[in-house]
Structure formats: structure tokens, C-alpha cells
Amino acid sequence: MEWPWSAIAASSSSSSSCFFASPNSCLSITRRTNLSCVNTSVKSLRHSRFDSKHNLVKRRINGDSVVRRSTTSNNSTEETESSSSSSSVDCVGMGSDVECVNNGEDEENRSSGILSGGEGTFLEWTVLISPFFFWGTAMVAMKEVLPITGPFFVAAFRLIPAGLLLVAFAVYKGRPLPEGINAWFSIALFALVDATCFQGFLAQGLQRTSAGLGSVIIDSQPLTVAVLASFLFGESIGIVRAGGLLLGVAGLLLLEVPSVTSDGNNFSLWGSGEWWMLLAAQSMAIGTVMVRWVSKYSDPIMATGWHMVIGGLPLLAISVINHDPVFNGSLQDLSTNDVIALLYTSIFGSAVSYGVYFYSATKGSLTKLSSLTFLTPMFASIFGYLYLNETFSSLQLVGAAVTLVAIYLVNFPEGND
């Protein structure tokens, strides 16, 4: 059996540490010089200095343990095993998606986990796909109760209970609470952009457009992320991704045109559900690029939970000030189905979906997981049609198809660009 070895250098006292991405990430391995490794996922350099007294050590991943084989001075070989102290992937839940940062372990070297070899059981596929199912169907559930409860109440209810559940889960797991002004300031700003603005714009948009169409527009946010990452982090866009950006703009225009033409002279930008959804997508995109900053100061799961709680409070206040129907006596008019829909959007559409995505991201390939994002608008469209009789016009169908192709091109693997 072949092991996924990565060569590393370690001192005999085992006191030095180096963070390794993969065998292909090492720029140089020379004695008396710097050993530089690139974490290809976060595009950062880690350096350590070694001298000729250091021994060559090989490492393999064995489940949750790290097995190291070293050659001693008398040329004998010894093998030790140590447990991994933390997950190799950190994820932050944002908007209706999750942003994950690989902390260094090569995805392809994960011999155990969900669909690691491209095959999997029915249960594994169900777990892998379930977050996208929950996010898509939560859009339908939200739209169903919006007229009865009000948009801002639904947005707040989706965030606050789910956030408290995630915080409780993080405490149960022994995750550290945010500490210091930097941690809380970053979470608060992240909450304002990714929770308050995103969910508020989303709820406003759902009042004026279909769940399926809105979900397609929301999922166009990788187009904006690609542009922001290029300007802020110097990440290369490339020919294929640039083509995807142009195609994405064309697709979004095709999605918006039917709304403009149908309203004629009465068209108002702020009365357009597609426009509100586009604003929500931009909020989510900005939240995506903020993840790296937030994760520097806080545990990812804690940050996810607290940003949902903090971001939901302004929405609740706006709901009260705006006299949403739920505060004007309509609460007693809620049917059992309405209550179930509200609970579903919060528990399954937020807390459970984020938790399952976290689990899948740490057990399987992030590339495979991110390639399934197109399922969210697909589920939203299918269940919007089944339960709300929503349909796409011919032009909107073309626009949705063009937009989804553009999203795929923007997420195109860099090595193939």
C-alpha cells in the first residue's frame, strides 16, 4: 500500500514546527536555508530555518492521527504516531453558503471521509447534498410566510435562534469564545454586512420575485467575489474566469429584463425583487472576502453563531419599528404549517445546513463540495414550482442557464485555466 508521504524537516528535540500543505507545495528543501511551503488554499507562505543536524522525517495521515517516520543518526528508522489536535479545515457560515479555508492538509490526501474516492454510499451522498437542499427549500418556506409575518421578522427569526444553537454547540464542543476588541469588532462588522444586510435584502427581494429566480441571483455572488479577490488579494482571474464574469453579467441582465419589460413605464428599481436579490448577493460576496479577516481573531463556528445573533438583532428592531404584521395581531393567525415553515428556515435553513456543511468540508474534498452549489437554485426552483406554482419565463430560463454556466467558469480550477 502506498502512503501519501510529505517530506518535512524536524529537529531532534521536536520543538520546531512547520505548517505543510502538500509535497508539491514545497518551494525548496535545502539544508542551512529556509524551507518555504505554500498553503495553496490560503495562498500564504510559512518559513522555518533548519540546519544540517536536523533529521528527515516523513509524515502520513492515518485517520485522525499523524504517523511520522524518521531516520536517526545511526540510520535506523523509528515511527511515531500522534493525534491531530484540530480540524484541517476552518469554515465560516455566511449568507446562504459557507466559506471554508483549508489549513494546509492536501484535500486529495484525505483517505477517509465523504466520497473521498469519488464514490460513496447513498447516505454519504444524502449528507453531502443536504445543505444545498435546505438552503434552496428554505427560500420557498420564507416566501410562504412573508405576507403573514413580515419580511424583517422572517429574516430575524432565521438568524437569531439558529445563531444561538450554533453558539451552544460550539460551547459544548469546547470552542473558545471570542476575546478582545479585534475579535468582537470583526464579528460585528461581519454580522452587519453578511447577516443584517444579506437577510434583509433577501427578505425584501422574496416579496417581489420567485424563490427560484431569487436563488439563482443570490448564487451569482462568486462573480463579485472573483473581482474583489483580484483587487484585494491579487488573485489571478485568468481567461476562463474573465469569460465567466462577462457571461455572468449577460445572464443577470437576461434575468432582469423580463421584470423591466412587464412593468413598462411603472418600473421602479426599488420595487424590483431582482434588484434586491442582487444587493443581497453583493452583501454575501463582501462577507465572503471578510471571512479570512474574521477567522484571524475568532473560532469559525463561534464567529458564525455570534454573527447570526448580532446580525439578527437590528432586523428584529426594524421589524418592530416597521410594524410587521406579526406584531399587529397576525401572530394568532399563524397556522401549524406557517410555524413549521418558520422553524424550518431557522433550524434547517441555517443551523443544521451550516453544521452539515462544516462536517462535510472537514471530511471530504472542498472542490467537490463547492461544485455542488448549483443545487441550491435548482432545489429552490423545483419546490417553488411544486408548492408556490412559480415559473420562469423563456428569457429567464436562458438567463438562469447562462448565469449558472458563468458561476461554473468562475469556479473553474486554476490549474486548468
From Swiss-Prot:
Transit peptide endpoints, chain numbering: 1-68
Biased composition (Low complexity): 68-89
TM annotation in the entry: 122-142, 152-172, 183-203, 213-233, 237-257, 269-289, 301-321, 339-359, 369-389, 392-412
Coiled-coil ranges per UniProt: none
Recorded topology in the membrane: Multi-pass membrane protein
Alphabetic keyword roster: Chloroplast, Membrane, Plastid, Repeat, Transit peptide, Transmembrane, Transmembrane helix
Any one cellular-component term (Gene Ontology): chloroplast membrane
Region described as Disordered: spans on this chain: 67-92
Family, per entry: Belongs to the drug/metabolite transporter (DMT) superfamily. Plant drug/metabolite exporter (P-DME) (TC 2.A.7.4) family.
Protein's name in the database: WAT1-related protein At3g02690, chloroplastic
Lineage: Eukaryota, Viridiplantae, Streptophyta, Embryophyta, Tracheophyta
